[in-house]
């Protein structure tokens, strides 16, 4: 199967599907259609009925080959790649029998070094796909697409493997947080699903952050600095004051595990107007609400010193911890856990310090945990995919549909 995985991943990663957060269309970029149309053709060649809507959501069905009435399971992956780094002219490189020594990426000065990325030490002997140092790879989440497609191919070639109805979904714009925004849960018509969008071997994730964005707008009064005493209000300094009132220890670079944070993503301005953009994250719903409350309290504390209330705050929720919807349905986690055990894969159920499409889909009525893909260092030139771990991910998909058929 390795050669098929390499060929398919190469074919998909060389198609530029970068999403654009500034766009107002869905998909956010026309080039995402290039991969969507290719996948539509490939699914149809496998004999699967497909449904590609005007927003770039591609659904397909592999019909049940058993008489028993078992739950319909879905498998999901996103076609877009991150806007954080160059995604054009991707030139995948193959490392056979990886030896954990530093590897120079193409003709660049970039080096894939286990001292910097220690998780590479667990991949000794694996076949890796990496970049040439000039682009991201796009294995996030094209590896997930490959794994779903190869699992479907295998099931088609092995009709003796019993399974219920399987729904497949390939979606746009996950990287800019809009993946589920126009996802039609009723049209997808699955009882539950799994995103193939994790990273390291053994990841099985069903806890995500609660997430919000806060935009702080500071309005100043611009006066000639020579006569500014008791008259000027510097919006930039108001922004600095606002940020200084948040706890220094509760930032991404000083937190881990279940610890939440405030993250200042952008700060720009002039004397007259400054804008701060934060993301707020916490696994605990109560702490999440307290974090949002703290933002409002800081606004009020600063505004109390002025007559015209110069600091404005706009907070918007982005997604919530999917554990709230998944934990009441333990069979959704028990199924992959049984499969992992059968395949001797150690299950890593640590919480996601982020979110997936499943975070939103779970609250839309489609409970959706996340499963590993075998890739790492997403969104940049050091991205890689272990073909060996991808093969295991294919086996997990096959094992899940077998387990559902056997255990109903």
From Swiss-Prot:
Its EC number is 3.4.11.4. GO terms for molecular function: metallopeptidase activity; tripeptide aminopeptidase activity; zinc ion binding. Zn(2+) 2 binds at residues 140, 175, 379. It is an enzyme of class 3 (hydrolase). It is found in: Cytoplasm. GO terms for cellular component: cytosol. The active site is at residues 80, 174. Keywords: Aminopeptidase, Cytoplasm, Hydrolase, Metal-binding, Metalloprotease, Protease, Zinc. Binds 2 Zn(2+) ions per subunit. Its cofactor is Zn(2+). One of its GO terms (biological process) is proteolysis. Gene3D superfamilies: 3.30.70.360, Zn peptidases. HAMAP family: Aminopeptidase_M20. Belongs to the peptidase M20B family. Cleaves the N-terminal amino acid of tripeptides. This is Peptidase T.
């Amino acid at each position: 199967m390795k050669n098929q995985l390499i060929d398919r991943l190469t074919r998909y990663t060389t198609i530029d599907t970068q999403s654009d957060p500034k766009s107002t269309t869905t998909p956010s970029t026309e080039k995402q259609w290039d991969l969507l149309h290719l996948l539509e053709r490939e699914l149809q060649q496998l004999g699967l009925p497909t449904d590609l809507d005007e927003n770039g959501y591609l659904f397909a069905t592999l019909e049940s080959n058993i008489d028993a009435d078992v739950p319909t399971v879905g498998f999901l992956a996103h076609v877009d790649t991150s806007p954080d780094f160059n995604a054009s002219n991707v030139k995948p490189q193959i490392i056979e029998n990886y030896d954990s020594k530093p590897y120079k990426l193409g003709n660049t000065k970039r080096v894939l070094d286990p001292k910097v990325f220690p998780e590479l030490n667990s991949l000794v002997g694996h076949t890796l796909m990496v970049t040439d140092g000039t682009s991201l790879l796009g294995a996030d989440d094209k590896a997930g697409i490959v794994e779903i497609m190869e699992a479907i191919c295998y099931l088609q070639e092995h009709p003796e493997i019993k399974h219920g109805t399987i729904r497949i979904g390939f979606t746009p714009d996950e990287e800019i947080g809009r993946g589920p925004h126009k996802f039609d849960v009723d049209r997808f018509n699955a009882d539950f699903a799994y995103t193939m969008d994790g990273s390291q071997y053994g990841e099985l994730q069903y806890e995500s952050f609660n997430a919000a964005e806060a935009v702080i707008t500071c309005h100043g009064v611009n006066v000639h600095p020579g006569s500014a005493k008791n008259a000027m209000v510097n919006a930039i300094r108001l922004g600095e004051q606002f940020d200084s009132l948040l706890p220094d220890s509760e930032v991404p670079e000083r937190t881990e595990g279940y610890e939440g944070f405030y993250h200042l993503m952008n700060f720009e301005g002039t004397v007259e107007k400054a804008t701060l953009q934060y993301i707020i994250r916490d696994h605990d719903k109560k702490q999440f609400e307290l974090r949002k409350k703290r933002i409002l309290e800081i606004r009020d504390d600063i505004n109390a010193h002025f007559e015209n209330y110069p600091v404005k705050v706009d907070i918007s929720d982005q997604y919530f911890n999917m554990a709230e919807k998944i934990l009441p349905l333990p069979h959704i986690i028990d199924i992959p856990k049984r499969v992992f055990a059968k395949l001797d894969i150690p299950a890593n159920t640590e919480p996601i310090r982020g979110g997936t499409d499943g975070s939103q889909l779970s609250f839309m009525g489609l409970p959706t945990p996340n499963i590993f893909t075998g890739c790492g260092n997403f969104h940049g030139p050091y991205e890689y995919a272990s073909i060996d771990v991808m093969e295991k991910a294919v086996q997990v998909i096959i094992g899940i549909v077998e387990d559902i058929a056997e255990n109903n």
